[in-house]
């Protein structure tokens, strides 16, 4: 309400319309749709314009569909036409806190906009259906936290002792209604979303003009007349003041929760003061960057040293592998030592001794040569003869392959045991390499055979599974 040029007429603003005191006194030219609003304002002309209350908005749009329908269950809550549900300890629990304070959650404005949620005079009407109480409970139901404040404000509502839409049928759950009002944070979020929809092409003047129009359409009329007495000022303040939010009993928080809240508060504060040029920033020189560079160089030097050690170990293995592949000394047949002898003069035997003529060399079949047995560990040949049918012959290559397979299985078990004890990969490799050298082979050959055995086992399992599937079919 403003006084114009010291005259006796006042100017009121309601829903963006500027009206003078003469318009209230001369109601003949006013349309029927505006009569209710003007008469409501005219009743308070002697005092001042009372701002809109939430129960007034609820009563005005009681016949309209609610903006949101919330179903509250014992262990979860969900909105109407929602596939899943939210838990009370989940990340969406802040919505219930905003509903309890009767405020629009600013983080959900984009979701409301994409879902085409209806706004009534910039507010959201919420219908809350409580499914937590059993059907056998009494009809006198404890009110919902979000609607207790509403019932305290609505002194003219004749239904105060039981929730709205409550019927004598005990099977129907109690229903409550509340209104979520906008805040400066939601207004700022609306302007940001609108600017993004125009690809940030709006100027500052256009945004300020838009903000002023929104405030004219949604906020209550202003009262700018100074009070004449202290009692009148107290009356003005009581009528303009909003009721306090409902008191809640907070559970005692632990040190971890308090630390998280403090960190979140500091993060928000730093975000708000990010572009503040007058903010004093203490200059504290540190050497964190130099320490980081030193740590990187040290790690690189350690990696290079490890690579050098690995290369040296591989070279040592390659040098020892030819020696390790040679058979042991006790298995090698000692070759006859050739002595240098001077050539002797061949003497013919006397004529009295008759020398028999040389016999031609007999040819034996091919399988006869295979019947000869190789020398045993002592260097002597085994007795020749036919080999029994129940004792198959094994070649040296097959014997070595069986030995390497056994070593591969033993190495796998040994590696798993060392790994369970906490040995590093380098230690396991060094231990297995020593054992392979002691067994007369190298670690690379054993690991290759181990991989082949692993692949063969996998193939056998796949074949067995395929056979089982075919048998089931």
Curated annotation (Swiss-Prot):
Nucleus: present as a keyword of the record?
Answer: yes
Q: Where does this protein reside within or beyond the cell?
A: Nucleus; Cytoplasm
**Compositional bias per record (Low complexity), positions renumbered to this chain:** 142-163, 304-327, 361-377
Q: Which UniProt keywords apply?
A: Cytoplasm, Nucleus, Transcription, Transcription regulation
Could you give a single Gene Ontology term from the biological process aspect?
transcription initiation-coupled chromatin remodeling
InterPro entries reported in the protein's UniProt record: Spt20 (IPR021950), Spt20-like_SEP (IPR046468)
Which Pfam families would you find in this protein's record? Answer: Spt20_SEP
The annotated phenotype of a deletion mutant is:
Leads to decreased growth at high temperature and sensitivity to several drugs like hydroxyurea, caffeine, canavanine and rapamycin; as well as to raffinose.
Residue spans of biased composition, Polar residues class: 335-344
Top-level taxon: Eukaryota
State the function annotated in the UniProt record: Component of the transcription coactivator SAGA complex. SAGA acts as a general cofactor required for essentially all RNA polymerase II transcription. At the promoters, SAGA is required for transcription pre-initiation complex (PIC) recruitment. It influences RNA polymerase II transcriptional activity through different activities such as TBP interaction (via core/TAF module) and promoter selectivity, interaction with transcription activators (via Tra1/SPT module), and chromatin modification through histone acetylation (via HAT module) and deubiquitination (via DUB module).
What family does this belong to? Belongs to the SPT20 family.
Share what the entry says about its subunit structure, partners included.
Component of the 1.8 MDa SAGA (Spt-Ada-Gcn5 acetyltransferase) complex, which is composed of 19 subunits tra1, spt7, taf5, ngg1/ada3, sgf73, spt20, spt8, taf12, taf6, hfi1/ada1, ubp8, gcn5, ada2, spt3, sgf29, taf10, taf9, sgf11 and sus1.
> What name has this protein been given in UniProt?
SAGA complex subunit Spt20
What is the organism of origin for this protein?
Schizosaccharomyces pombe (strain 972 / ATCC 24843)
Gene that encodes the chain: spt20
């Amino acid at each position: 309400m403003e006084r114009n040029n010291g005259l006796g007429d006042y100017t009121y603003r309601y829903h963006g319309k500027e009206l003078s005191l003469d318009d209230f006194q001369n109601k003949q030219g006013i349309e029927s749709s505006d009569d209710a609003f003007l008469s409501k304002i005219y009743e308070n002309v002697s005092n001042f314009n009372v701002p809109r209350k939430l129960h007034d908005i609820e009563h005005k749009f009681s016949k309209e569909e609610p903006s949101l329908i919330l179903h509250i269950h014992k262990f979860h809550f969900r909105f109407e036409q929602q596939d899943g549900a939210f838990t009370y300890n989940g990340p969406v629990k802040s919505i219930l806190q905003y509903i309890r304070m009767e405020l629009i959650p600013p983080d959900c404005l984009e979701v409301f906009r994409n879902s085409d949620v209806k706004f009534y005079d910039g507010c959201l009407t919420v219908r809350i259906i409580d499914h937590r109480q059993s059907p056998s409970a009494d009809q006198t139901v404890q009110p919902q936290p979000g609607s207790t404040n509403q019932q305290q404000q609505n002194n003219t509502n004749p239904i105060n002792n039981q929730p709205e839409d409550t019927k004598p049928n005990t099977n129907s759950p109690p229903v409550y209604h509340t209104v979520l009002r906008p805040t400066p944070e939601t207004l700022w979020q609306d302007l940001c979303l609108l600017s993004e929809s125009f690809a940030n092409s709006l100027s500052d003047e256009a945004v300020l003009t838009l903000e002023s129009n929104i405030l004219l359409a949604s906020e209550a009329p202003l009262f700018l007349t100074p009070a004449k007495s202290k009692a009148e000022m107290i009356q003005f303040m009581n009528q303009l003041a909003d009721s306090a939010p409902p008191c809640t009993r907070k559970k005692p928080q632990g040190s971890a929760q308090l630390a998280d809240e403090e960190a979140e508060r500091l993060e928000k504060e730093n975000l708000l003061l990010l572009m503040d040029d007058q903010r004093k920033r203490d200059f504290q020189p540190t050497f964190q960057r130099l320490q980081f560079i030193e740590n990187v160089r040290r790690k690189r030097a350690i990696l290079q040293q490890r690579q050098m050690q690995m290369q040296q170990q591989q070279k040592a293995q390659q040098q020892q592998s030819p020696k390790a592949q040679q058979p042991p000394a006790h298995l090698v047949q000692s070759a006859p030592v050739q002595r240098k002898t001077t050539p002797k003069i061949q003497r013919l035997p006397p004529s009295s001794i008759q020398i028999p003529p040389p016999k031609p060399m007999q040819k034996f079949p091919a399988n006869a040569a295979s019947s000869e047995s190789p020398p045993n560990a002592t260097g002597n040949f085994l007795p020749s003869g036919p080999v029994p049918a129940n004792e198959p012959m094994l070649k040296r290559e097959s014997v070595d392959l069986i030995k390497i397979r056994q070593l591969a299985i033993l190495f796998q078990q040994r590696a798993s045991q060392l790994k369970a004890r906490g040995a590093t990969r380098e230690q396991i490799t060094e231990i297995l390499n020593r054992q392979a050298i002691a067994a007369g082979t190298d670690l690379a050959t054993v690991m290759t055979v181990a991989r082949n055995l692993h692949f063969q086992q996998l193939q056998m399992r796949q074949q067995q599974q395929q056979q089982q599937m075919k048998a089931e079919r």
